Amino acid sequence: MARFPITIKGFHKLEQELKHLKYVERLKITTDISTAREFGDLSENAEYKAAKERQLLNDKKIYDLENKLANAEVIEITKINSNSVKFGARVVLLDRDTEKEVVYQIVGEYEADITQNLISIASPIAQALIGKKAGDIIEVITPKGGRFYELLKVQYVDF
């Protein structure tokens, strides 16, 4: 797995998810397996099979999260001093079609959440913004065609 950028906040969120899977979910599943064993014949025990499937799924999630954490490149965005857009930037854009301002923060792919205006570094809009400065006009290609934005402000602050 290649290294990937992530904010400190995103890294801690993945750590918390891993702890929950290891110390809460795993314990619950182990208890469910023990309880299901008491029902008798394991070859026809649906509860046992379901609990074992949940155990496999949980173990896979744990493995995946451990790999993500091992390959994460934590970026402390408040220490970035730049007037151009890079990973971690909070940008204020003016949509040239609607004349409405929109604010996005560019984050890693595992912490993106459009409902919180957190966009992945791999997204088309983030890719169009990388390297740009306040005052630049950018075009983002969407399935409905090009969309133009004016970059009003670039900041490096926590979200």
Curated annotation (Swiss-Prot):
Keyword terms of this UniProt record: DNA-binding, Transcription, Transcription regulation
PROSITE patterns named in the record: GREAB_1, GREAB_2
UniProt-recorded Gene Ontology molecular function terms: DNA binding; RNA polymerase binding
Record function comment: Necessary for efficient RNA polymerase transcription elongation past template-encoded arresting sites. The arresting sites in DNA have the property of trapping a certain fraction of elongating RNA polymerases that pass through, resulting in locked ternary complexes. Cleavage of the nascent transcript by cleavage factors such as GreA or GreB allows the resumption of elongation from the new 3'terminus. GreA releases sequences of 2 to 3 nucleotides.
Protein name per the record: Transcription elongation factor GreA
Highest taxon above the source species: Bacteria
Organism expressing this protein natively: Orientia tsutsugamushi (strain Ikeda) (Rickettsia tsutsugamushi)
UniProt keyword Transcription regulation present: yes
Record gene name: greA
SUPFAM superfamilies: FKBP-like, GreA transcript cleavage protein, N-terminal domain
Keyword RNA-binding among record annotations: no
A GO BP annotation: regulation of DNA-templated transcription elongation
Pfam families (UniProt xref): GreA_GreB (PF01272), GreA_GreB_N (PF03449)
Gene3D superfamilies associated with the record: Transcription elongation factor, GreA/GreB, C-terminal domain, Transcription elongation factor, GreA/GreB, N-terminal domain
Family the entry assigns: Belongs to the GreA/GreB family.
